[in-house]
Amino acid sequence: LLSLQEEKQYFMNDNSKYGVFIIEFLRADDCADGEILSQILELSNIDVIYKWANNKIHLAELLQEFKKSKFRYLHISCHANETSLEINGDEITNSEFESISKDVLKNRRIFLSACKAANRDLAARLVSKNNAYSLLGVPINLRFDKSALFWPCFYHLINEIDASKMRREDIVETVKKCVNLFNIPVNYYAKSNYPNKLRRFKIRVG
């Protein structure tokens, strides 16, 4: 893992700004937890942009909008499994998502409100290959009610800690609090010192 000094230098060379860019693509009859999250973040005076993606091409366009926004955090709300994300009855394989986000994720953090998407394969593609700073999400099928509560709590606590830079230690400690509160397992993948390597934190109750 990067040392604290290396992590500080890493961010000093970055021109991103504090904010959460939410991209959601769920089924028509699903509760839009990403939209609900955006409304709560607005109430908390946290900079947020919310977008709904209709298909693969639209998703690729929205990822470019995220890049232009310079927001540091990308939050994705969708259905998923270990090998792909679901969008409007179609699927985006982990490999396809790696391809359309290739020039987008450098020095950014990714948060996935997507069942089983926080796995080593997708993390390796987005963190190790596409240079995202980290990826965080749940490794299980998560009920909507828990998702709708977990993410606002997480972002609220992070915002209380530091709105300028979010360190690895801040994430781990904050996630531990949320995991214990909601009884939800979380996988957190972070950039490593070693080329094409990443570190996984399995954060569980207790």
PLM regions: where:
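Active-site-proximal C-terminal subdomain of hydrolase catalytic domains
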Residues: 116-206
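A domain-level signal for caspase-like cysteine endopeptidase catalytic cores
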Residues: 4-71, 113
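Short, conserved loop/helix-junction motifs that constitute active-site signature segments
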Residues: 14, 101-106, 127-130
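Short amphipathic alpha-helical segments and helix-helix/interface helices
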Residues: 38, 63-64, 94-102, 123-127, ...
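Hydrophobic/aromatic beta-strand patches that form the interior of the parallel beta-sheet core
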Residues: 21, 110-111, 134-136
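Structural alpha-beta junctions
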Residues: 41-50, 106, 129-138
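Catalytic-core segments of thiol-dependent peptidases
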Residues: 52-119
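Short strand-loop junctions, especially beta-strand C-caps/beta-turns
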Residues: 23-25, 79, 115, 140-141
